[in-house]
């Protein structure tokens, strides 16, 4: 039998038998909201980079934080669903605006960095999300403590680097941050599944977790590529 004649069973590939149907429906809502966030964040980034109508700064950062807190404080119910989706869209928009300075930096170095970083982030996020979805339930939840410890270490090193000003430490933080965020995609995806299995169906807030994972991954990868490109240009000179 010719192995090239075999048909791929896509239904089997997309079958998550260890996840209950209600949780699968919940995940569909989470990823639909995530897609909305990506679209709105792209609009926010466009406003900063192209139109300059709204610029990233202290006000946009505070606005983003305020909307996230407001969203978190608003209880999840059918009556508040539309309001919370509006808050989510506003948060995603200002988050996109906040990406503006990093985007401008990369455009100044090499505009091709942006599509490369986005496609790379999308591939990383998709692969790690599928790994978490296909894996045995709770198999990645042990990462929580390790990831939080790594985040604390990164925070301390970033604060220390304010005094040392080491470019090597900054770049090491970028690479470590990229690795940590890959871990958070695994952890957050499985945590969302477990919360949904235990009755927590707040898909809007669960979407925030994954959206922040993606944005942070994108920012880290974008800056890594930008620094590598700058190093290549220096070597050519």
From Swiss-Prot:
PROSITE patterns named in the record: BI1
Topological region Lumenal: 51-52, 108-112, 161-166
Record field: transmembrane: 30-50, 53-73, 87-107, 113-133, 140-160, 167-187
Residue numbers on the Cytoplasmic membrane side: 1-29, 74-86, 134-139, 188-206, 228-237
Record carries keyword Amino-acid biosynthesis: no
A GO cellular component annotation in the UniProt record: endoplasmic reticulum membrane
Oligomer and partners: Interacts with BCL2. Interacts with BCL2L1. Interacts with ERN1.
PANTHER family reported in the protein's UniProt record: BAX INHIBITOR 1 (PTHR23291:SF32), BAX INHIBITOR-RELATED (PTHR23291)
Protein name per Swiss-Prot or TrEMBL: Bax inhibitor 1
């Amino acid at each position: 039998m010719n192995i090239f004649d075999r048909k791929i069973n896509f239904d089997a590939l997309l079958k998550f038998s260890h996840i209950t149907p209600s949780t699968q429906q919940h995940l569909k809502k989470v990823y639909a909201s995530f897609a909305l966030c990506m679209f709105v964040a792209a609009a926010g980034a466009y406003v900063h980079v192209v139109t300059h109508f709204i610029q990233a700064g202290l006000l946009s950062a505070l606005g983003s934080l305020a909307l996230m807190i407001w969203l978190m404080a608003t209880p999840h119910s059918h009556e508040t669903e539309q309001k919370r989706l509006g808050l989510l869209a506003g948060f995603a928009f200002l988050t996109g605006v906040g990406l503006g300075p990093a985007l401008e930096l990369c455009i100044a170095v090499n505009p091709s960095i942006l599509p490369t970083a986005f496609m790379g982030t999308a591939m990383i996020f998709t692969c790690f999300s599928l790994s978490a979805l296909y894996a045995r339930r709770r198999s990645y939840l042990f990462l929580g403590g390790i990831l939080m410890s790594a985040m604390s270490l990164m925070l301390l090193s970033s604060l220390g680097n304010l005094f040392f000003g080491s470019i090597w430490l900054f770049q090491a933080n970028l690479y470590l941050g990229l690795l940590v965020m890959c871990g958070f995609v695994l952890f957050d995806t499985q945590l969302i599944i477990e919360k949904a299995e235990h009755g927590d169906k707040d898909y809007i807030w669960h979407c925030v977790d994954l959206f922040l994972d993606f944005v942070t991954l994108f920012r880290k990868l974008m800056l890594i590529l930008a620094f590598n490109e700058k190093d290549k240009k220096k070597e050519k000179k």
